[in-house]
Each structure stands twice: as C-alpha cells, then as structure tokens.
Amino acid sequence: MSVKELKERHMAATQTVNDLREKLKQKRLQLLDTDVSGYARSQGKTPVIFGPTDLVCCRILQGHTGKVYSLDWTPEKNRIVSASQDGRLIVWNALTSQKTHAIKLPCAWVMTCAFSPSGQSVACGGLDSVCSIFNLNSPIDKDGNHPVSRMLSGHKGYVSSCQYVPDEDTHVITSSGDQTCVLWDITTGLRTSVFGGEFQSGHTADVQSVSISSSNPRLFVSGSCDSTARLWDTRVASRAQRTFYGHEGDVNTVKFFPDGNRFGTGSDDGTCRLFDIRTGHQLQVYYQPHGDGDIPHVTSMAFSISGRLLFVGYSNGDCYVWDTLLAKVVLNLGAVQNSHEGRISCLGLSADGSALCTGSWDTNLKIWAFGGHRSVI
C-alpha cells in the first residue's frame, strides 16, 4: 500500500470518527432534557446576591517586576506562592502582605508553581521542561539564593502545570507541552507513571492544566489544546478513563468540584463547562456574551467551598463570580474599585474558603475577602 493510500485511509477514518462523535453528541443532547440551571429554576432557586461589601480587596501584594503567571495557597491558608515573568518565586504572608521568601529560579521562564501539602516546599516548572522542588527550610547559599532540592527531568516540552498529590509531600503531577502528564516520586526524582504520549487515549496536543481530586487522590483531570479534558486514574496510566468533549478552543484550566464527582473547565472559546465524571455528561455551560463581539479567553478558575460559586479569570481583566446553579454572573471583580489593570492569569481560593487571591499581568496579586454578612459560601 502506497503512502498516498495510507493517508487517504487515515483521513477517511478520522472523518468517520468525527461524524460518530457528532452523532453521539446530538444523541446525548436529545436525552438530556435539562441542565443544572434549568432544574434549579424549576425548583424555585434564586441567584446569590452580592452587596458592595460582600467581596472586597483587602490586600495588594506588590513585589514582582514582571507578569504574574501562577499562584497557590498553603493548606493552612496564611501563605501564598506566586511565579512571575521576572524569574522569581515569592512566598507571601497573606495576613501581613510581607514576603517571607524570594527565590531566584535557574530558568527565568517559569509558568506554574504549587505549595506542598505541608507547606514546607514549593514546586515550579516552565520552558526548561523541568519541575524544580525547593525546600523552604533549606539554608540559602553564599549568593543569597535558595538551592534546588530536586529537579524532576523527563518531559520533552514545557511544564505548564504542577500539583502535589493531596496529603503527600512526596508525589507531584505535572502537565506538559509534550502532550503528557507525569506522576513523579520526589524522593527518588523518578517518573512513577506517564499518562498519554504513545498511548492512543492520551491528548493529541499540549496539556495545559491538571487538577487532582481531593476526595480520591488517585483521580485527576487534564485539559489540553486539543479542546478536550480527560479523566485519569494513577493506577492505570495506559489509558484515560474518560474523554470529555464540548469546547471549541484550547482548554486552559481544569478544576475539580468540591464533591469530587464533577469538574469544571475553562477555554479559549470563552466558556466554562461543568462535567460529571460518572456519566460523562456536560451539566452546564457558563458564558457571558459581549456586545463588541470579542470573546475573552478563560485563563483560570476556582470553586467556592460549597461549590455554589465559581470564580473565573479572563484575558481581558474580568473576573466573574458565577452562581453555578443558575449560570448567572453575580459579580465582576474586574469592574469594581481596586480591580486589576491587566489580564487575570491565575486565581485561587484559600483552604477555608474565606479569601480569594488573583494574579495578573499587571505584576500584582490581590487578596479579596468575604465581608458584610458573608464569611464563606
């Protein structure tokens, strides 16, 4: 068989797969007689209402000299680590706004950072294709820099996201531009499992984000530039447990819902979507039309402790607070006093749900606290 014939057969097979996928999508839509917001309205649910003092900017963390790309909270809620275009990780005291650590990175092109569950170490990765681990208790060297305690090398593309396995300081999961995710043993520095790559059920484009289930740490979700999200079990690296379709652009961010049975995705297509890992169904779409026709990309997301609220950062500087039940925007932090002056690149909620931190290309991080009659939702 000639190369031309092989290409033609491959194209025909690809078209058949796409046609079947579209038929499956339409059949699911026929069987799905309602979505989350439709059911909530039928039950008389009303939107969450925010007053002017219910979520206010209480801290501005200034110290980076470049765009802020990533942030993460410690489990005890008092500290934040941020990664910036200036080639530094900064650990902040969220209560006082003071910097407790400023780590100059071997590679300035950092894209992601994460706190360990104990809060004793931080991980980061970027265009050097390495996930670097720093022990915050290690003494600094003669030049005043924190030494790298472990370098996790093996990816063949940039490291786009990293997250420690809950309740473990010894394992971290990374996603990469090489279309794979990797589970690492930090103690040995070796790869425990590789998800994707040569396996056909893996992603077919750069993987942008991972989220590990807090209720079942063996499960994690990945989002990719192939417009899909995939559910993985760390015990079965050879295949994805389920693939979730629906987006029409790169999936930039994924986040598990608090109950561990659902997860959210955010995409370049301007939408966030809520999926059920048990049925594979899309439960809800969160999209706010813009009159100018411009569609801002979704860059980051986080659920409130109860899951009733969804915080979403956008490329145009908006930061919407969505009511997840009714799919309504109840607040836009990009339109209030002290809002960011650039793209919202990252955000995260404190462990107790009492504060939200946002990071931006304006080089600043801002901490937003629930006030008024709300303490957490």
Curated annotation (Swiss-Prot):
It comes from the Eukaryota. It holds the Pfam family WD40_Gbeta. GO terms for cellular component: cytoplasm; heterotrimeric G-protein complex. Keywords: Repeat, Transducer, WD repeat. InterPro entries: G-protein_beta_WD-40_rep, Gprotein_B, Guanine_nucleotide-bd_bsu, WD40/YVTN_repeat-like_dom_sf, WD40_repeat_CS, WD40_repeat_dom_sf, WD40_rpt. The keyword Repeat applies. GO terms for biological process: G protein-coupled receptor signaling pathway. WD repeats lie at residues 63-93, 105-135, 154-185, 202-233, 246-276, 293-323, 339-369. GO terms for molecular function: signaling receptor complex adaptor activity. Belongs to the WD repeat G protein beta family. G proteins are composed of 3 units, alpha, beta and gamma. Guanine nucleotide-binding proteins (G proteins) are involved as a modulator or transducer in various transmembrane signaling systems. The beta and gamma chains are required for the GTPase activity, for replacement of GDP by GTP, and for G protein-effector interaction. This is Guanine nucleotide-binding protein subunit beta-2.
